[in-house]
């Protein structure tokens, strides 16, 4: 029997679907014969009592979640997410460069520092990559500080705003699609596959439609997912490390392009677990037993 801790924060349990997901992790642990407790920021001193830690809180190198990951690693405990995954995924420049080195297909991408955010550079990039362009701040999350620009003056205005948060920005080719694939992976294995279908006339999952409608999450059984989709997702995840990842992918004319690799991927009840309800047990098995517990999964 293993003693497992889930580090979370108060804001995480304000959402019913996330609270239910946390409960599902606990039920899965009990059914597998393990103990699982929720640990909050003011209870970190008790983490030494546990064998492994699952982080279900906002991750960033400046957040408590990163301290938890580093501490667990220094104590020799298994932890999700790893500190390496947090560092890489919270810096999109680092993440995209790793994907490029691993020859993972991504949209055409450029990195600009402050001196390059000019209308002249914008004109050249519109000619090279098309219109619109997507600008991203390196440390953005949940689609914040990610914007489309259609004119040089718009490019400069948004770029300079993003540079208040970082010393570089990411510029990418825009790939229009009706949905994004999300493949959740762990240690070279596929845990779940979903489609995030955008609201009408929207291009980001977090955007609501004109009538207030939200994006729709549709679960896809792992064995029904396109093999090339899974191959690309696993390659992208491996380019970061072997932690728990949510790989966002666009399908364009039968080709797959990685949009992002996310650490600490959302696992919400009735959404990411739709077609793969065993995801909770798989994560618990990994924490309690290690990578060998995932040998039966595709990957």
Which role does the model predict for each range below?
Residues 238, 251-299:
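C-terminal active-site "lid" helix and adjoining low-complexity regulatory extension at the edge
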Residues 38-40, 172-173, 182, 242-253:
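A short glycine-rich, hydrophobically flanked beta-strand micro-motif that places a catalytic Asp/Glu
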Residues 144-237:
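Phosphate-binding site of ATP-dependent enzymes
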Residues 72-145:
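A conserved helix-loop-beta module that forms one wall/lid of the active-site cleft
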Residues 58-60, 139-140, 264:
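Short glycine-rich anion-binding loops that position phosphate/pyrophosphate groups of nucleotides
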Residues 133, 189-192, 245, 257-260:
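Protein kinase-like catalytic core scaffold
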Residues 1-80, 84-85, 117, 292:
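ATP-binding N-terminal substructure of ATP-dependent carboxylate-amine bond-forming enzymes
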Residues 42, 120-122, 154:
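Short acidic active-site motifs
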């Amino acid at each position: 029997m293993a003693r497992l801790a889930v580090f979370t924060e108060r804001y995480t349990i304000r959402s019913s679907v996330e609270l239910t997901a946390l409960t599902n992790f606990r039920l899965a642990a009990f059914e597998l014969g393990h103990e699982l407790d929720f640990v909050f920021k003011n209870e970190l001193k008790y983490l030494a009592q546990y064998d492994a830690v699952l982080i279900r809180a906002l991750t960033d190198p400046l957040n408590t979640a990163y301290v938890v990951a580093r501490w667990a690693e220094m104590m020799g405990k298994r932890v999700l997410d790893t500190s390496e995954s947090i560092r890489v995924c919270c810096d999109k420049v680092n993440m995209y460069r790793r994907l490029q080195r691993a020859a993972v297909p991504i949209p055409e991408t450029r990195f600009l520092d402050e001196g390059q955010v000019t209308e002249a550079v914008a004109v050249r990039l519109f000619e090279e990559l098309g219109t619109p362009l997507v600008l991203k701040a390196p440390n953005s999350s949940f689609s914040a500080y990610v914007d489309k620009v259609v004119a040089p003056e718009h490019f400069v205005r948004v770029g300079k705003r993003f540079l208040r948060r970082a010393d570089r920005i990411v510029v990418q080719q825009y790939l229009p699609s009706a949905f994004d694939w999300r493949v959740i992976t762990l240690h070279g294995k596929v845990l779940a596959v979903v489609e995030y279908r955008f609201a009408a006339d929207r291009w980001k999952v977090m955007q609501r439609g004109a009538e207030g409608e939200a994006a729709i999450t549709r679960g896809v059984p792992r064995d029904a997912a396109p093999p090339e989709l899974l191959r690309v997702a696993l390659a992208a995840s491996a380019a970061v490390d072997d932690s728990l990842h949510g790989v966002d992918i666009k399908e364009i004319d039968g080709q797959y392009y990685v949009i992002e690799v996310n650490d600490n991927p959302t696992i919400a009840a009735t959404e990411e677990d739709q077609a793969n309800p065993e995801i909770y047990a798989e994560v618990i098995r990994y924490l309690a037993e290690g990578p060998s517990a995932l040998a039966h999964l595709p990957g």
